[in-house]
Amino acid sequence: PNISHLKNNMVIENLNKYSEEQIASLQEKENVIRLIISEQPNRCNLEHLRKYAIKSDTNIQLCLCAEDNNIIKFDVFECLAEKVVDIEIYNRKRVLTSIIGISIFRNLNKLIISDLYDDKIVLDELVQLEKLEILGLVLNGDLDMRQYETINQLFSLRRLEVKGLDSMLLDKLPNLENLKCHNLKDGTQLGYKMPNLKSITIYKSPKIRDLNFLLGMKMIQCIYLYGLSNLSHVPNLCNLPNLRRIGICNMKRLEQMPTLNRELESLDVEKNVPMLGVDSFRDVTPINLPNLKWIRINLGNDVKSNMILDRFKNICETTRW
């Protein structure tokens, strides 16, 4: 048996090896139990856990990391289902083909499916989960049409991470606040489809030829751009009144920093931005950015980086790393 405490969670591994007496002795203080599931769990031990360790305000996180997560059947967790608020499924060795049965977790708030999973995995049951706010389909295939149909019905979503998103295929998601896109295909409708978006992160997306769609995001507070190496230009962002943070990383063709609004608080530019020189930052000054609290500039050259950072010395926090 393996039990530990991490970030205010009680973490339980190898539950199948626990005796009833050991489970009865568990002292859960943080009201969060994180179950690490690497094999089909023993139903009796789950019942014991419910009997001895689960309180009225206990929340359960399930972390599925078996060699083949397809062998883990959700119905075995039925006795704990109402307490499960978070499910993370990491598929490092075998492709996950199904999440059938996941709708028993009526209080599920967060679902992450990572690494190897069937590109066409059926998500239909998620529509029944009215409290689902966070969905991540991470690092595998692009969305298919049936998956779009499901996502378009997840009106409670606040955070979404996906690959291959095409905004033309989305319906309005009025509650979405945080979007992470890998290989974004089309972003032209994001401002309209996600009117309350506050944070957007865009990773390597070779089909994106410009970022003008950012200008339609009137509620946006944070913009992070990573690996958009085919873009030489970011539009001026000074008319985004709520923008407070921007990060730019690994944009090897970017030639000029965009104009930023005076309310900006955090600026981060680093890693493989060879076309950016000191002159590219001519408007990055304390006068133009009077509310800046933190700035990182790493142009791969200490002298050039420091020439920009020194403008903010003793004004805000500065770093190259």
Mark where each language-model region is:
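Concave beta-strand-loop units of leucine-rich repeat
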Residues: 11-19, 31-48, 56-76, 83-101, ...
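N-terminal amphipathic/basic-hydrophobic helices that include classical n-h-c signal peptides
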Residues: 1-7
